[in-house]
Amino acid sequence: MESPRVEESYDKMSELKAFDDTKAGVKGLVDSGITKVPQIFVLPPKDRAKKCETHFVFPVIDLQGIDEDPIKHKEIVDKVRDASEKWGFFQVVNHGIPTSVLDRTLQGTRQFFEQDNEVKKQYYTRDTAKKVVYTSNLDLYKSSVPAASWRDTIFCYMAPNPPSLQEFPTPCGESLIDFSKDVKKLGFTLLELLSEGLGLDRSYLKDYMDCFHLFCSCNYYPPCPQPELTMGTIQHTDIGFVTILLQDDMGGLQVLHQNHWVDVPPTPGSLVVNIGDFLQLLSNDKYLSVEHRAISNNVGSRMSITCFFGESPYQSSKLYGPITELLSEDNPPKYRATTVKDHTSYLHNRGLDGTSALSRYKI
C-alpha cells in the first residue's frame, strides 16, 4: 500500500496559526475525533521512523552502594564512562528517588494534560519569559523545522530560581517541585561520576559551571491516527551538560547507535540519562551527545519528563571550550569556545530541524 501523499501546495502558515489559536494542542485534535494527521504534522519521507534494531542491549547501571564501597564506586564510574563514550545514553536504577515520587510526578502531569481543554486554555502561552509555559511545539513557526511534532508540553525553569507553587497548573505543581529537588541531587551525582570518568576531580564539572540551570520539559504524546507520518519529537541532540528523563511504560524513545535506531525499554523505576552537546564539547568528543527521537503510536498516550542540566544561558557569559586538562599534542581541541547564551540562542532561532548544532563549533 502506498503511503499517504503530501499535498504539494497549502498555506502552511495559516494552518499553523489556526492550530495555535485553538490553544487546545495536539490533545485537542485527538479529542475532536480526527482520523487523519493534519498536513502541518506530516514529515518528509526521509524523516519518518523506520524499522528499529533489536539486537543491541541498552546499558543499565545500578547505582546501589555508590557511596559505601570504593570498589563498587569505581565499577560504576567505569560503566558510566563506557556508556557515555559508546552510547551517549544509559539507564540508572537504584538512583535514590523513590518510586512513589516518580509515579506521583507522572500522574500529576498527565492529569493536567487530560483535563478539559477549556480548563487548560488559560495556561496556554508562547511567552518564554514565564517560568512555567504550557504550549504545543515551542518552535511551531520556525521555517527550518520540517513538521510540527505530535506532542503538547509544559516547560518549567526549576533552578536557580524556581517558580512558586502558584505559578504551576494545580494538578502538577507540587509533584514537579518535589521531583526537581530529588533529580537535582541525582544530577550532581552524575556530574561527579562523569568527572571521574574523564580522570578529573569529582567536583570538576559541577564547579565548572558559573550558574547551575535546571530546565524541565513535561511532554504529553497523544495517540496518533497515522503514526507512520509524524513523530512525537524528531531526531535531535540535547543542548546542555546532562539530561535525565522520566518516562512512563508506553515506550517510544529511540536512540541512534552505530547508525541504527534502538528502542530504549521503559524499565519500571528507572531513569534515562544522556550526554548533552556541551559535555561532548567540553570532553573533546570523549563523551557523545547522541541523536534521539520519540516516535508516535496509535494506541494510548505517552508521558515523559525531561530534565536538562547545564549552565544558565541568562546569567553567564563564560566561554566554554574543550577542558584544558584533557588536551595534549595527540588530543588537540576539536571545537572553538562558545557561550551557553550563543548556543541556546542559535538553537531557539533554528528550532528542532533534525541536525546537531555542534558542527558549527568544529575546528
From Swiss-Prot:
GO terms for molecular function: 2-oxoglutarate-dependent dioxygenase activity; L-ascorbic acid binding; metal ion binding. The keyword RNA-binding does not apply. Belongs to the iron/ascorbate-dependent oxidoreductase family. Residues 212-312 form the Fe2OG dioxygenase domain. The keyword 4Fe-4S does not apply. SUPFAM superfamilies: Clavaminate synthase-like. One of its GO terms (biological process) is fruit ripening. InterPro entries: DIOX_N (IPR026992), IPNS-like_FE2OG_OXY (IPR044861), IPNS-like_sf (IPR027443), Oxoglu/Fe-dep_dioxygenase_dom (IPR005123). Transmembrane segments: none annotated. This is 1-aminocyclopropane-1-carboxylate oxidase homolog. Pfam families: 2OG-FeII_Oxy (PF03171), DIOX_N (PF14226). Fe cation binds at H236, D238, H292. It comes from Solanum lycopersicum.
